[in-house]
A protein has these predicted regions:
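C-terminal and inter-domain tail/linker signature
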Residues: 1-159
Length: 159
Protein backbone atom coordinates (compact mmCIF):
# COMPACT_ATOMS: atom_id res chain seq x y z
CA UNK A 1 0.00 0.00 0.00
CA UNK A 2 1.39 3.43 -0.91
CA UNK A 3 1.41 6.32 1.56
CA UNK A 4 -1.42 8.00 -0.35
CA UNK A 5 -3.47 4.80 -0.22
CA UNK A 6 -2.78 4.47 3.52
CA UNK A 7 -3.90 8.03 4.25
CA UNK A 8 -6.90 7.72 1.90
CA UNK A 9 -7.89 4.62 3.87
CA UNK A 10 -7.35 6.47 7.18
CA UNK A 11 -9.63 9.29 6.03
CA UNK A 12 -12.07 6.68 4.71
CA UNK A 13 -12.17 4.91 8.08
CA UNK A 14 -13.16 8.16 9.79
CA UNK A 15 -15.66 9.13 7.09
CA UNK A 16 -17.12 5.64 6.76
CA UNK A 17 -17.60 5.27 10.51
CA UNK A 18 -16.17 1.76 10.32
CA UNK A 19 -14.40 0.80 13.57
CA UNK A 20 -12.89 -2.28 11.92
CA UNK A 21 -11.23 -0.20 9.20
CA UNK A 22 -8.56 1.19 11.55
CA UNK A 23 -6.86 -2.09 12.53
CA UNK A 24 -5.33 -2.91 9.11
CA UNK A 25 -3.93 0.64 8.89
CA UNK A 26 -2.41 0.95 12.35
CA UNK A 27 0.46 -0.69 14.19
CA UNK A 28 -0.62 -2.69 17.25
CA UNK A 29 1.06 -0.16 19.53
CA UNK A 30 -0.48 2.89 17.84
CA UNK A 31 -0.06 6.21 19.67
CA UNK A 32 -2.75 8.80 18.78
CA UNK A 33 -3.57 12.29 20.00
CA UNK A 34 -5.55 15.33 18.90
CA UNK A 35 -6.90 18.45 20.66
CA UNK A 36 -9.89 16.48 21.99
CA UNK A 37 -7.87 13.75 23.70
CA UNK A 38 -6.94 14.62 27.28
CA UNK A 39 -4.20 12.00 27.22
CA UNK A 40 -2.52 10.25 24.30
CA UNK A 41 -4.43 7.17 23.20
CA UNK A 42 -2.59 3.85 23.08
CA UNK A 43 -3.67 1.12 20.68
CA UNK A 44 -6.40 0.73 18.11
CA UNK A 45 -9.12 0.00 20.69
CA UNK A 46 -8.64 3.40 22.36
CA UNK A 47 -8.63 5.10 18.95
CA UNK A 48 -11.87 3.33 18.03
CA UNK A 49 -13.47 4.44 21.31
CA UNK A 50 -12.50 8.03 20.55
CA UNK A 51 -13.79 7.77 16.98
CA UNK A 52 -17.11 6.29 18.17
CA UNK A 53 -17.63 9.24 20.56
CA UNK A 54 -17.01 11.66 17.68
CA UNK A 55 -19.27 9.69 15.31
CA UNK A 56 -22.08 9.78 17.90
CA UNK A 57 -21.75 13.56 18.33
CA UNK A 58 -21.24 14.28 14.61
CA UNK A 59 -23.16 11.53 12.78
CA UNK A 60 -22.48 13.04 9.33
CA UNK A 61 -18.76 13.67 9.96
CA UNK A 62 -16.31 13.17 7.14
CA UNK A 63 -12.71 13.96 6.33
CA UNK A 64 -11.74 15.40 2.97
CA UNK A 65 -8.27 15.80 1.55
CA UNK A 66 -7.31 19.45 1.06
CA UNK A 67 -3.85 19.36 -0.43
CA UNK A 68 -0.68 17.53 -1.26
CA UNK A 69 0.69 15.22 1.37
CA UNK A 70 4.31 15.62 2.36
CA UNK A 71 5.94 12.26 2.92
CA UNK A 72 9.14 10.32 3.09
CA UNK A 73 9.63 6.70 4.07
CA UNK A 74 8.97 7.33 7.75
CA UNK A 75 6.72 10.40 8.10
CA UNK A 76 3.72 11.93 6.39
CA UNK A 77 1.86 15.21 6.91
CA UNK A 78 -1.67 15.00 5.53
CA UNK A 79 -3.81 18.15 5.29
CA UNK A 80 -7.56 17.64 5.32
CA UNK A 81 -10.75 19.16 6.61
CA UNK A 82 -13.31 17.71 8.96
CA UNK A 83 -16.92 18.52 8.17
CA UNK A 84 -19.93 17.60 10.27
CA UNK A 85 -23.01 18.65 12.22
CA UNK A 86 -22.93 18.57 16.02
CA UNK A 87 -26.10 16.53 16.74
CA UNK A 88 -25.35 14.91 20.13
CA UNK A 89 -23.42 15.91 23.25
CA UNK A 90 -19.66 15.52 23.27
CA UNK A 91 -17.58 15.59 26.45
CA UNK A 92 -20.35 17.46 28.29
CA UNK A 93 -21.03 19.96 25.49
CA UNK A 94 -24.71 19.70 24.52
CA UNK A 95 -25.60 19.37 20.85
CA UNK A 96 -25.56 22.71 19.04
CA UNK A 97 -26.91 21.45 15.68
CA UNK A 98 -24.25 23.59 14.02
CA UNK A 99 -22.24 22.54 11.00
CA UNK A 100 -18.46 22.89 11.38
CA UNK A 101 -15.58 22.91 8.92
CA UNK A 102 -12.22 22.39 10.61
CA UNK A 103 -8.95 22.44 8.73
CA UNK A 104 -6.70 19.71 10.08
CA UNK A 105 -3.28 18.22 9.58
CA UNK A 106 -2.44 14.67 10.57
CA UNK A 107 1.26 14.24 11.27
CA UNK A 108 2.04 10.53 11.13
CA UNK A 109 5.00 8.31 11.81
CA UNK A 110 4.98 5.09 9.82
CA UNK A 111 6.33 1.68 10.72
CA UNK A 112 6.32 -1.14 8.16
CA UNK A 113 3.63 0.60 6.11
CA UNK A 114 1.31 1.20 9.07
CA UNK A 115 0.52 4.18 11.26
CA UNK A 116 2.60 4.06 14.44
CA UNK A 117 2.11 7.59 15.78
CA UNK A 118 -0.59 10.01 14.66
CA UNK A 119 -1.05 13.56 15.89
CA UNK A 120 -4.07 15.46 14.64
CA UNK A 121 -3.83 19.25 14.69
CA UNK A 122 -6.78 21.64 14.37
CA UNK A 123 -7.81 24.97 15.89
CA UNK A 124 -9.91 24.11 18.94
CA UNK A 125 -10.81 27.78 19.46
CA UNK A 126 -12.15 28.00 15.91
CA UNK A 127 -14.17 24.83 16.52
CA UNK A 128 -15.67 26.39 19.67
CA UNK A 129 -16.52 29.57 17.74
CA UNK A 130 -18.23 27.58 14.98
CA UNK A 131 -20.19 25.65 17.62
CA UNK A 132 -21.29 28.93 19.24
CA UNK A 133 -19.47 28.22 22.50
CA UNK A 134 -16.89 31.04 22.29
CA UNK A 135 -17.02 34.50 20.69
CA UNK A 136 -15.43 35.03 17.30
CA UNK A 137 -11.92 36.45 17.08
CA UNK A 138 -11.71 40.22 17.25
CA UNK A 139 -15.27 40.60 18.52
CA UNK A 140 -16.33 42.58 21.57
CA UNK A 141 -17.18 39.26 23.22
CA UNK A 142 -13.63 38.01 22.73
CA UNK A 143 -12.21 41.24 24.16
CA UNK A 144 -14.47 40.93 27.21
CA UNK A 145 -13.40 37.32 27.65
CA UNK A 146 -9.73 38.33 27.51
CA UNK A 147 -10.30 41.05 30.12
CA UNK A 148 -12.03 38.53 32.39
CA UNK A 149 -9.08 36.19 31.97
CA UNK A 150 -6.68 38.98 32.97
CA UNK A 151 -5.33 39.86 29.55
CA UNK A 152 -5.43 43.52 28.63
CA UNK A 153 -6.04 44.87 32.11
CA UNK A 154 -2.66 46.58 32.31
CA UNK A 155 -3.11 48.16 28.90
CA UNK A 156 -6.54 49.45 29.91
CA UNK A 157 -5.17 50.97 33.15
CA UNK A 158 -2.26 52.63 31.37
CA UNK A 159 -4.39 54.39 28.79
Amino acid sequence: MTVDELIDSWEGAWSGKDPDAFAPLCAADLHYEDPLTAEPLEGVDELVGHAERLWAAFPDVRLERTGERLANRRYVAAPCKLLGTHKESLEGLPATNRFVVLHCVFYCELQRGRLLRVRGFFDLYDAAVQLGVLPSRGSLGEKALLVLRGFGLRAARGQ
